[in-house]
Amino acid sequence: YRKLLESKDIDGVIISTPLNWHAPIVLDALAAGKHVFCEKAMARTLDECKAIYDTYNQSDKVLYFCMQRMYDEKYIKGMQMIHSGLIGDVVGLRCHWFRNADWRRPVPSPELERKINWRLYKESSGGLMTELACHQLEVCNWAAQKMPESIMGMGDIVYWKDGREVYDSVNVTYRYSDGVKIAYESLISNKFNGMEDQILGSKGTMEMAKGIYYLEEDHSTSGIRQLIDQVKDKVFAAIPTAGPSWRPETKMEYTPHFIIDGDIHVNSGLSMIGADKDGSDIILSSFCQSCITGEKAQNVVEEAYCSTVLC
């Protein structure tokens, strides 16, 4: 890659390599005077992230990391709704990403195992955290408009006991200074719940990946009102002396509203659940435009840095 960077005909480069190569190539590319677009996460270690961040701030070159949710229309509009108070105060954040696949790719020769399946080994990957959680933690900080102050978590190799080094199951809790918490979970041996970035507010809930929100006022029946309705509908022959005065509330009883008006075509697969355009093409187009104008993107490097250090 160093020979490529020596070319004066090249204005910018796209880096799509194993994570442990991000920092060396980004730093060399900036030093060579190239604009840079790099896959997430920012880098493998905290020191590498700091080196990239500091170098970028001293450079006049453009640097992007593929945080495509920042360019996804439903995420942008959803965040505007959240910050305008539509769902009230943000009181909790819940994110999950579930798959059912071993994350392996075919290896034609044993000596290529760690190069092809680099995501499975600690020297080249942070596992589920850097490969998946990085995107979702950026969304949480975006909604909360700050960084967590403390973290606790655990991970294990629960199912794919095939010689891999990174966990196939992780649970992490992040706490903000005001007590609001992120509950994060990811595993790759069950895909039932798919992927979601859920923002919980005192007046409603946003499910960002689906582009849907629910308002608490759409469903607010008191316990005594429920009991009266049950009697009225002859669910009970008489008022019970020790019967229930409430029933469990479930999401299905809330009215969903689309973040973006009009038809939203939803796709589902191993990687994403969301609108057809998830922001990936837009952020890449923005990078190309920045290469022409030299104008730096707002907050992309900062968000990539903050979400990566949480992984």
What spans do the regions from the language model cover?
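C-terminal helical cap and adjacent loop that interface with cofactors, partners, or active-site loops
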Residues: 131-142, 148, 152, 169, ...
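Predominantly a Rossmann-like dinucleotide-binding segment in NAD(P)-dependent oxidoreductases
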Residues: 58-64, 69-164, 174, 182, ...
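Short hydrophobic/charged patches on amphipathic alpha-helices used for structural packing
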Residues: 1-2, 79
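Generic hydrophobic alpha-helical segments
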Residues: 26, 78, 287-291
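Short, well-ordered coil/turn residues at beta-beta hairpins
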Residues: 16-17, 180
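Beta-strand-loop-alpha-helix segment that lines the small-molecule cofactor/substrate pocket
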Residues: 18-19, 23-71, 85
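Short, solvent-exposed loop/turn and secondary-structure capping segments
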Residues: 24-28, 48-49, 75-76, 104-108, ...
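N-terminal Rossmann-like NAD(P) cofactor-binding module of classical short-chain dehydrogenase/reductase
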Residues: 12-14
